[in-house]
Amino acid sequence: MFALRAASKADKNLLPFLGQLSRSHAAKAAKAAAAANGKIVAVIGAVVDVQFDDNLPPILNALEVDNRSPRLVLEVAQHLGENTVRTIAMDGTEGLVRGQKVLDTGYPIRIPVGAETLGRIINVIGEPIDERGPIDTDKTAAIHAEAPEFVQMSVEQEILVTGIKVVDLLAPYAKGGKIGLFGGAGVGKTVLIMELINNVAKAHGGYSVFAGVGERTREGNDLYNEMIEGGVISLKDKTSKVALVYGQMNEPPGARARVALTGLTVAEYFRDQEGQDVLLFIDNIFRFTQAGSEVSALLGRIPSAVGYQPTLATDMGSMQERITTTKKGSITSVQAIYVPADDLTDPAPATTFAHLDATTVLSRAIAELGIYPAVDPLDSTSRIMDPNIIGQEHYNVARGVQKILQDYKSLQDIIAILGMDELSEEDKLTVARARKIQRFLSQPFQVAEVFTGHAGKLVPLEQTIKGFSAILAGDYDHLPEVAFYMVGPIEEVVEKADRLAKEAA
């Protein structure tokens, strides 16, 4: 007993020493790992095999090719045997040779974060690509992170008011939700995205992050210039409201598969450290999956359905689960979705749909009527379109608007064949109100003032509900439908009608 007590006392005396020893060992191990050198043994397109004699870097660590300009970062994807890792290149591998020296950085890809990234364009590894000098910050974060714990998440369902009538009324966005933005070329996706960025900054004081994943370089350049014109990015002072992260179509698949995570990391900093409600735009989420499938084949994984990677659901889930509301702030994500060959059952879009809370569908038919934003009020949906979340009045008005628009749609064939005169009085009233509602769903955007000549309007949700409720009740049946076009709240309809009447007189 005495011997045991003495031994335990001796152990206690040893504890501080053991602690020092383990700390020094950990420091030495970290130093050795950070200083680990390897050499390239094989290059297969975007995949590079690197051999290390000791201190094999863990999976997802960033390696750097020595003496190469511009900087080439490799991300560890697999361990082959005892001393070789298979990595994915974040840039072109042209000119790499066997035996070339590679350094282990000791941690995953780290990028600059914080307010200094606003108004700037960075690439997948966090380097500025807008020719405006380095990003002056010492705050960095790793692009790979765990999703927030359950205890950190906020379970309250809350609307993110965008100030855009058609969105707030018929397919409202949930704070921390994920929205799919469907639309072809030229129907106004970019303008809608810019208006959302602008409104969130003005109404909530929040920041936005735009991740261009595998998009056209020309489109990325146009968006940047349009944001400068629209005042979303300011080159003169620090009032920019958006950070841009680009990995274009011409980039290797490694960069396109990781650039969405880079954008998400910038957004996570604003949410977790500054308590912001952040908007994260991803254009296009399909390219994230596409890049993953390109890399997967090179890594030697057996493809699954339609040639996609076997880890498709895991890759998508690990990214989407990080986009959520916590008790500190929220990330609301708007994701443009390309549907290959218009096949909604394709594994890539089908996997994305499982994560969406709302869909905003832009329709060419509505754009052709000159109604912008060209959001389809019957095709767009939202998970929070529930009276328990949005309130009974909002729910009733939204359903009333959709019903009258659906009735008008079913009457259009009769009108086309027989004309308006053949309709009953009740149907004529339905058509008149539906056309007024259709025009009242249009709205002048602040970022498009330069092109339209109309002053932009941000409409509070209460005024939106009040306006549509009054139109449904027939309070404005006496006003001409042209008065409802391109205005903000319902009071402006009355003003516009009075003005038109005076001009006509």
Swiss-Prot record:
ATP binds at residues 183-190. GO terms for cellular component: mitochondrial inner membrane; mitochondrion; proton-transporting ATP synthase complex. PANTHER family: ATP SYNTHASE (PTHR15184), ATP SYNTHASE SUBUNIT BETA, MITOCHONDRIAL (PTHR15184:SF71). PROSITE patterns: ATPASE_ALPHA_BETA. The gene is ATPsynbeta. This is ATP synthase subunit beta, mitochondrial. It catalyses: ATP + H2O + 4 H(+)(in) = ADP + phosphate + 5 H(+)(out). HAMAP family: ATP_synth_beta_bact. SUPFAM superfamilies: C-terminal domain of alpha and beta subunits of F1 ATP synthase (SSF47917), N-terminal domain of alpha and beta subunits of F1 ATP synthase (SSF50615), P-loop containing nucleoside triphosphate hydrolases (SSF52540). Keywords: ATP synthesis, ATP-binding, CF(1), Hydrogen ion transport, Ion transport, Membrane, Mitochondrion, Mitochondrion inner membrane, Nucleotide-binding, Transit peptide, Translocase, Transport. Its main location: mitochondrion. Residues 1-31 form a transit peptide. SMART domains: AAA. CDD domains: ATP-synt_F1_beta_C (cd18110), ATP-synt_F1_beta_N (cd18115), F1-ATPase_beta_CD (cd01133). F-type ATPases have 2 components, CF(1) - the catalytic core - and CF(0) - the membrane proton channel. CF(1) has five subunits: alpha(3), beta(3), gamma(1), delta(1), epsilon(1). CF(0) has three main subunits: a, b and c. InterPro entries: AAA+_ATPase, ATP-synt_VA_C, ATP_synth_F1_bsu, ATPase_a/bsu_AS, ATPase_alpha/beta_chains, ATPase_F1/V1/A1_a/bsu_N, ATPase_F1/V1/A1_a/bsu_N_sf, ATPase_F1/V1/A1_a/bsu_nucl-bd. The keyword Aminoacyl-tRNA synthetase does not apply.
